[in-house]
Amino acid sequence: MASAGKPALDDSRRGTGSPKMKARENAKDTLCRNVTIYGRCRYEDKGCAFNHDPLKVNSAYQFDSKKRFNVDSPSFTPSLLPSNGSSPTISSATMKKMATISPKAANAAPFQPRSVASRSNTSTPNSRQENINPDWTVAEVQEFVPQGFDVAHMTALQGNGNGTITPTNAFDPFVTASTPLSAGGAVGPVQPNPYSHDSAALGGAAFFPGSSGFQQPVQYHMYAPIGPHNQNTLGYQRNVHDLFLPNDFREELQKKAAATLQTLPNTQLPAQIDYFHSLVPLDLNHQKNATVFGFPSWVYKAQSSKDGNFYALRRLEGFRLTNEKAIRSVQAWKRVCNGSVVTIHDAFTSRSFQDSSLIFVTDYYPLSKTLAEQHLGTGQRFQGRHNVHIPEQVLWGYMTQIANALKAIHSNGLAARIIDASKILLTGKNRIRLNACAIMDVVQYDSQRTVADLQRQDLVNFGQLIVTLGANSPTVMHNPTKAMEHFTRAYSPQMKNSVFWLLNGLQKDQDRNIDIFITGISSQLMSTFDSALHLDDQLTSDLSRELENGRLVRLMTKLNLVNERPEYEHDRQWSENGERYFLKIFRDYVFHQVDAQGDAVVDLGHVLSCLNKLDAGSDEKITLVSRDEQSCFIVSYKELKKALESSFQALLKPARRMH
């Protein structure tokens, strides 16, 4: 029986035909999907039955389109059009009318598809050519095409390529696109590219976005990395400096802030000098030294009672003012505003130190050093240690900054008169400022030397300072010949010639002023200026990381202002239900986490992560459980942010009505 029934089963299979075998037979006319996706098929020479030539498939597709559409057939004209959204009711008279062809339909021009007409040689009669409407094409939206994919497959989607759209045919971006190998050349709606600009407003202009569009507001929780980016790191690598302020810069600012706020209790200093209080001595050497000014001088940090700022007070001990015009000369120095000169704010006499003292008020730079302390070993803890040789580029930086200071001073008809390593402040990395400039104008007010002579003396003092720094010895100018020999061996000829020109500043052989000197070192000025620009870029980049760093504090402030307000317990409009109940449970989720043993979880990372997501309004959903564990809610951070903003605005409404 089994053998007898077997042939009948085979006959039935041969009669119906196997779909798998039919697909095998048509495999040679089907384009391999590997070619469409990857551009090539690795099994092409290993028995793959599909076609690997896109041109053959395209020609077969065009031939199939020509077979399916007959251009000589009459156009179809429906005799009854349904209304919008309603199905028509067809009567017997209407059915009879539809059974016959109207004379208008018999004389109509033959139907010709647009996609076929562009590829066939058949043309419509010339008498009907003028009445044809402009060709309708789909918006040429730039789409992703895999590598190796033949662009001929997209011809059915591009229409005739004239780039025009009939206004009555609005583009619908939500209609699913038809595949190139379906519908036999019919033009279907194309799914827009989500990465193209304003795809719904494209009028055939694929590469020109619309003029109007909604601009999203700035998201302050996102920090944009501002240049410069000089680190040789890969795209996935991150440094600590990419996330926070550089440690050395942060520590330096914190130390300066601590030094500014430092106080000295139980001190023998006066409690107040004029309008200054909280004096702290800044001198490292407690021995009296009257070498520079002719009077022992001391420096203090003090706070002003007028504006609350901190200033440096330089006191000349034992000075007696004999001429009131001498102290008025400080008024001219108040007009000197230069980045390389320490600004002078005031000068007055005082007897608060139980003597007659002259006080100069200048800007205070915390943790600053003098060039003598930095390079000449003055005040060092280990006296036997040799000083480090100053690189030439650093020395050029000092020269350009001092030249900048002298340019500003001489332009105001003044002279520095004090250019000494012990009176030049180093306030930052290779950043110096000329200090104690106005003191000699008060102390030696009766001097008979002219301003021009004093300005030339500034050039000589300038040259002696550079030689002293280059030799790393404060007493090197006692033997000028030996000092210049060492300087010539250590530095370039341009540096040597510049210093020689400064040392000969008092000679009358030629006109010597600071402008001529600046012209001679103009090439080094550009190098110093470039370094200043790089520092500005770096500081701007560091500052951008600290932008809006108080946003989490504002967020926590809003949460605490909204949650658990006892005065609104019986207010129906402010009862803790709905969105305010979510915020209350969310506060417990962020700050009141417990572990499996019931101990409090102090996780700063969890708190910052939740607050950042709340500030950003993330779509991430979290599960919130009530305190009695009887209610469970699944909400997103976006919903929580919206609830927080609405609750906070509702909290402000009574205050607005009062005002």
From Swiss-Prot:
Residues 523-561 form a coiled coil. One of its GO terms (molecular function) is poly(A) binding. It holds the Pfam family Pan3_PK. Keywords: ATP-binding, Coiled coil, Cytoplasm, Metal-binding, mRNA processing, Nucleotide-binding, Zinc, Zinc-finger. The keyword Zinc-finger applies. One of its GO terms (biological process) is nuclear-transcribed mRNA poly(A) tail shortening. PROSITE patterns: PROTEIN_KINASE_DOM, ZF_C3H1. ATP binds at R314, D363, Y364, Y365, P366, L367, S368, K369, T370, S422, K423. Its main location: cytoplasm. It is found in: Cytoplasm. Homodimer. Forms a heterotrimer with a catalytic subunit pan2 to form the poly(A)-nuclease (PAN) deadenylation complex. Interacts (via PAM-2 motif) with poly(A)-binding protein pab1 (via PABC domain), conferring substrate specificity of the enzyme complex. Regulatory subunit of the poly(A)-nuclease (PAN) deadenylation complex, one of two cytoplasmic mRNA deadenylases involved in mRNA turnover. PAN specifically shortens poly(A) tails of RNA and the activity is stimulated by poly(A)-binding protein pab1. PAN deadenylation is followed by rapid degradation of the shortened mRNA tails by the CCR4-NOT complex. Deadenylated mRNAs are then degraded by two alternative mechanisms, namely exosome-mediated 3'-5' exonucleolytic degradation, or deadenylation-dependent mRNA decaping and subsequent 5'-3' exonucleolytic degradation by xrn1. Belongs to the protein kinase superfamily. PAN3 family. This is PAN2-PAN3 deadenylation complex subunit PAN3.
